[in-house]
Structures are given as structure tokens and as C-alpha cells.
Design a protein with these regions (language model features):
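A short acidic, Gly/Pro-enriched loop at the edge of an enzyme's catalytic core
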Residues: 42-54
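A short beta-strand submotif of the Rossmann-like class I SAM-dependent methyltransferase core
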Residues: 56-59
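A short glycine-rich, Lys/Arg-flanked "PGG" loop and its adjoining helix->strand segment in the class I
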Residues: 67-82
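Conserved class I S-adenosyl-L-methionine
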Residues: 82-113
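Class I SAM-dependent methyltransferase SAM/SAH-binding core
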Residues: 1-43
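Helix-to-beta-strand junctions that scaffold the AdoMet/dcAdoMet cofactor pocket
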Residues: 3, 30, 63-64, 77-79
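Core SAM-dependent methyltransferase catalytic element
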Residues: 123-146
């Protein structure tokens, strides 16, 4: 309802997650409002300048080549398109080792707000904004393809 005549695409590199997503979104898939695709952020199966918005929630830590993956998202965004990255596990100066146990167990690396801003800029994004949720490490980073 909220997307009007638009369409939402979901991607994941896990076949199990794709199966779950298709089950959860069955109605909207049948109405051709949602399409779920098995793919990697490193090689998105979409034409250049295809999307108005790309949103990634709690996935950045797992990307194999963060700079190139951000450039791949930049490629599929339309001019003035936006990327939105959402993080819970944010490394902060106050608690630099807060997520260390998770990093070690899962094999990921958390990043700081400044590192996220720098990577978005290196990938070509402009008008970069970051928004923190007070009292938490939640962060939303937004960049624009000009």
C-alpha cells in the first residue's frame, strides 16, 4: 500500500533466507509488488540506475568487500537515489570493545560512525548524514548519488 505503483526488491545470498522471505511476502509477490532475489551485494543482478532507494539493515558487517560493494549499490541507484545503512553494532569511543565477543564468534568487524561516513564518501555518495538513536548504538547512515 505504501509503495503505490512501485516495487520492492529483496536480496540475500542465503537460499534459506530467500525461502523464508518468499513465504513471508507471498501475497505481495503474487501481486507483483515484491520480488525476492538470490544474489550478493558484490554483484547485483540489476541494470545501472535502476533504484530510487537501497536499504541495508544489519548486513554491512558481512559484506565481503565493503568499498566495492558500496560502489555496486551506487551503480544501481538512479541519480539522486539514496542509500540507507542501518547498524546496531556500532563501535563507539566510549565502548570500543562492546561487540568484540560477537565479532570473534561470527567473524565480522564492527565500524565507527566516522568509518561509515568515509566509506560512503569513497564510494561516491554525497550529502552524507548519520542519525543515532539516543541511549543506544543504533545508527542510520544515508548518502545520495548525485
Amino acid at each position: 500500500e505504501r509503495i503505490g505503483n512501485g516495487k520492492v526488491y529483496g536480496i540475500d545470498y542465503s537460499a534459506l533466507c530467500i525461502k523464508h522471505s518468499k513465504a513471508q511476502n507471498r501475497k505481495n509477490i503474487l501481486c507483483n509488488k515484491v520480488k525476492i532475489v538470490l544474489a550478493s551485494v558484490s554483484s547485483l543482478p540489476f541494470e545501472d540506475c535502476s533504484f530510487d532507494v537501497v536499504i541495508a539493515v544489519e548486513t554491512y558487517y558481512f559484506w565481503p568487500d565493503k568499498l566495492n560493494d558500496l560502489k555496486e549499490i551506487y551503480r544501481v541507484l538512479k541519480q539522486n537515489g539514496r542509500i540507507m545503512l542501518v547498524f546496531e553494532m556500532l563501535k563507539t569511543p566510549e565502548e570500543p570493545d562492546k561487540w568484540k565477543a560477537v565479532e570473534d564468534k561470527v567473524g565480522i568487524k564492527t565500524v565507527t560512525e566516522e568509518e561509515i561516513r568515509e566509506m560512503l564518501a569513497k564510494a561516491g555518495f554525497e550529502d552524507i548524514e548519520t542519525h543515532k538513536k539516543d541511549g543506544t548504538t543504533w545508527l542510520c547512515a544515508i548518502g545520495v548519488k548525485k
